Amino acid sequence: MTCLTVLLDPGRLKRGVGPNRMLGPPLKVGERYMLAVGPGMIDANGRPLRERFTKAFTVCEAVRAAIAIEDWRVLPPKADSRDPLELTFPTSLDWAGLWQGIIVVSGGGEQISGRVGIDQDEMRWRFTPDAAWQAGFHSIRISPDLEDACGNTPYGAFDGPFRSAEQISLETTVRSVPFEVKGARGRT
């Protein structure tokens, strides 16, 4: 598992604040960048990396809207199988957040144990249960902390308008997306 979070000055990212107005955004749209991490850097477990890692990327226009869960595509599995539940997203989501920010819950409310897989540039999330799927309704629970690459959450844009304490308290609730497991694999 490879994960590195690069934090850029929020003042350079948010529109209309001092650092952004004076210096502009830290990355330029259309430019290609290469992130390189050399051997010897300490990983999350306190061990030095053995080899160099690189990831190339091109900067696109910032997404300045909440994550639209209603635009996700849910492909439910077939009952009595261990086929994966598959979610596809219209844009990439935060890789680290996808591992912990989405769980699957049975119709009875218990978390279903299984393995998560993430691919297609963080635009597909797959969950393979440890035991066969039971027919019926289940739900996908989405953490309010899940972010896309621009820092947007299911509750709002990273640089959205000021929100009241009441609005912020609503943002701590977990969103749920129901899905049905039937006898034959189908789309919802």
Stretches found by the model and what they are:
Residues 1-188:
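Acidic, low-complexity Ser/Thr/Gly/Pro-rich repeat segments typical of extracellular/periplasmic
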